[in-house]
């Protein structure tokens, strides 16, 4: 449940910005009526000057640039691993410490290039012999091994060996 809340918390500013862009671009009131046009007066004849409402509207290009800059700033900050607590407010109790650490790893790992992550794994200190999935020799040894035979019975002192007929 917390994960869904965090996803909603991250994506909600982008949804509000998209709604504002849509309202400014099409003159719609998206918040009420789910995209249906607001009750606007009928269009004026072509000879009349444009209304003040249209001429005072914010340019979509300026808003797009602002949104792009904000998105780049957030992505850069997360990718650089800077203090993510300043971007998102998290409780700082001991119970949530591990959740916060895994949250940071999740976002940073999705933003890093695959080659960097692969090199990071390759340079770590775990035993590669146990984990090496590309080792074809171990596959050959597994599939070409001989089945184990049961141990041969040894006669006890003073007894004859049993012979099967």
Swiss-Prot record:
Signal peptide as annotated in the record: 1-18
Modifications the protein undergoes after translation, according to the UniProt entry: O-glycosylated; contains pentose side chains.
Sites of 4-hydroxyproline modification: 42-43, 45, 49-50, 150-151, 153
Region (Disordered): 33-70, 142-165
Entry GO MF terms: hormone activity
Broad class of the protein's primary localization: secreted
Keywords, ordered alphabetically: Glycoprotein, Hormone, Hydroxylation, Plant defense, Secreted, Signal
GO cellular component entries: extracellular region
Induction description: By methyl jasmonate in leaves.
Function: Activates a lipid-based signal transduction pathway in which linolenic acid is converted to jasmonic acid, a potent activator of defense gene transcription, including proteinase inhibitors.
Name of the featured protein: Hydroxyproline-rich systemin A
Taxonomic lineage of the native organism: Eukaryota, Viridiplantae, Streptophyta, Embryophyta, Tracheophyta
